[in-house]
Structure formats: structure tokens, C-alpha cells
Amino acid sequence: MPIFVQIHPLPGQQLPQSFESLAEMLGNIPGMFFELDGSFVWVDHEDTPSSQMDGMVYDRLGKLAYIEVKGACNARQWLTLCRAVCGFAGPPPLALKNGEAESGYAASGYDAIERIARVHRVVEGDWTTASEIASQLPLHRQSLNSSSTLSRLPRPS
């Protein structure tokens, strides 16, 4: 499922990163290409079929204003991007065990992201959460054609 969204801070708040710190974090993600004008492309050839997200980072007064993202991705990539935007380094805290997502979410999972950011769905013109977007994405894009029952991440409780 392709997405076209913008990640914004919650009203009255700021995203915790500077343009430069986000550029550094995104530059460390395999397959991510970040340009100094704020544009980025993330291609994951390990996903089947290959997924690609294109985006643009907008900043104002030394802080991130919002990030626009378009393309196709899986839920793990979406979480990785949201975590970077919100200042959380390292891999996502979700781990798969025996084909099922573990029930616990670490403090830097969606619960922490949603205390910092909200998501604007551009085409639909409404606001939602990062976890709601993730619930609409496959765990791996190859699961779009898979008979596996696990094709989506569960929403945190």
C-alpha cells in the first residue's frame, strides 16, 4: 500500500531533532540516500518487491518543521523512519518470534513516537497516528502475496 503522509510535531511542541542530526541518523540507514537540500530516498532491495520511500525534510528556526514521505514501505521501515524523526537511534524495538509480533512495545516504540509526533494523511486530508499507518502496512512487502496470516503489525494497546 503506497503512503503519502507528513510527520508533524504535536500541537504546541517541536520535533526534538535538528535538520543536521536527522540527516546524520538517516544517512546511517542502509539503502538511505540523503541530500543536503532535505530530500531523501530509501530503497530496500531486500524487500520483495523492492520498496522505495521518497521524502523531504522541512526545517524552521533550527528545528524540524515536518517531514513529507511518499512511496511503498513495510511496517518495519515505517517504524524506523518515525523513530529517526523523533530522535530514537538504533533498530526498532519490535522483534518477531515464531511468526508473531511480540506483545510488548519498548518505550521508544509507537507509544513514545505518539507523545512527540502526529501524521497527516495528505490525500485523505486527516490526522492519524504512526501506529495507525503501520497497521495498514505489511510486515514485509512480500507478504502482500503471501498466504501468511501475519501481514500487519498489531497496534499497540
Regions found by a protein language model. Give the residues of each.
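Acidic (Asp/Glu-rich) sequence patches and key acidic residues
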Residues: 1-157
